[in-house]
Regions:
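Extended beta-strand/beta-hairpin segments
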Residues: 1-33, 41-133
Length: 133
């Protein structure tokens, strides 16, 4: 379950309870890692560019999946029954250490939403799949 990311080799796996060998993070952990590292890098670059006194950034992420009942008027099913909606929720908590004003802290949190991975996850995504021999 190794994968290449440029010159780097990563290991992804599932927990033993899911049939894996637990030799590495599962795919959702890798997704959260991408968002977390991108968030912290974006914040750090912004703070450096603006000369903010930011000593440390910590990003903690959690993923959960919920099912929301469909609205009564929403009826995409052929039999007229409304389909429930499965929603993936990513919870992100950012801890900023340093001598920042309340306004600077608020602006840094706004900048966090501008990291490229955040924009990809919240934007329109197309995934094109093809077979390769």
């Amino acid at each position: 379950r190794g994968l290449q990311a440029g010159r780097h080799t990563l290991v992804a796996d599932e927990p033993e309870a899911m049939g894996g060998t637990n030799l590495g993070p599962d795919p959702y952990a890798l997704l959260l890692s991408a968002l977390g590292t991108c968030t912290s890098m974006t914040i750090r670059m912004y703070a450096n560019r603006k000369g903010l006194q930011l000593d440390d950034v910590k990003v903690e992420l959690h993923h959960r999946r919920i099912t929301r009942p469909a609205a009564p008027q929403a009826s995409d099913a052929p039999n007229g029954a409304a389909a429930d909606e499965v929603v993936d929720i990513l919870e992100r908590e950012i801890t900023l250490a340093g001598n920042l004003t309340d306004a600077e802290r608020q602006r840094v949190l706004e900048i966090a939403d501008r990291c490229p991975v955040h924009r990809t996850l919240t934007g329109h995504i197309e995934i094109n799949t093809r077979s390769k021999a």
